[in-house]
């Protein structure tokens, strides 16, 4: 549901009210009100419409100018770290370390999210198989096709078994 402010509720996994983000004089998000229930949801719009800015804002990666919201019950203005621990995020941009093997890239993502090393390695093997990269897991990411890089980013997002998965331009470059 997009549009029309509503009070925060337990039935929504993502909810914003009057969310505003400005970069200097540029208005990137203009009083965004949305409420998303569990399930699959897509966010569509032209280039420059603010989709990535909205995703980074609800993840607590960039600060709001005004307004507020909650993701999985956590305040987006003050609890970004807690939100990111519960969410798998597959960014649009290149975020992989080129010379690192896929297995170590995914393991490293798990460790950054608080997993111990042995659990992260075990889970990295599982998610790389899940995304179809079992046989390529010991290859350097720099040798991967764009599709394989996207699959590696997805594995990084899934490593910690998140409650919610957010993919920004998951088919970018495919």
Regions found by a protein language model. Give the residues of each.
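Walker A (P-loop) phosphate-binding loop of ABC-type ATPase nucleotide-binding domains
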Residues: 46-50
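Conserved ABC transporter NBD signature motif
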Residues: 67-78, 82-83
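Conserved ABC ATPase "signature" region
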Residues: 107, 111, 118-136
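Hydrophobic anchor residue at the start of the ABC signature
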Residues: 154
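Conserved catalytic motifs of ABC-family nucleotide-binding domains
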Residues: 161
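Catalytic Walker B motif of ABC-type/P-loop ATPase nucleotide-binding domains
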Residues: 165-168
């Amino acid at each position: 549901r997009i549009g029309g402010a509503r009070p925060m509720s337990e039935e929504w996994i993502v909810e914003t009210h009057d969310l505003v983000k400005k970069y200097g004089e540029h208005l990137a998000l203009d009083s965004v009100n949305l409420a998303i229930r569990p399930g699959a949801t897509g966010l569509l719009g032209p280039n420059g419409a603010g989709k990535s800015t909205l995703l980074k804002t609800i993840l607590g990666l960039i600060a709001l100018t005004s307004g507020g919201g909650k993701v999985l019950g956590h305040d987006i203005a003050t609890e970004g770290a807690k939100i990111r621990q519960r969410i798998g995020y597959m960014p649009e941009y290149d975020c992989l370390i080129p010379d690192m093997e896929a297995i170590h890239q995914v393991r490293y993502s798990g460790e950054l999210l608080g997993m111990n090393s042995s659990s992260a390695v075990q889970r990295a093997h599982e998610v790389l198989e899940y995304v179809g990269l079992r046989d390529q897991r010991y290859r350097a990411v720099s040798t991967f096709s764009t599709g394989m890089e996207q699959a590696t980013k997805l594995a990084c997002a899934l490593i910690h078994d998140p409650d919610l998965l957010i993919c920004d331009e998951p088919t970018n470059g495919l």
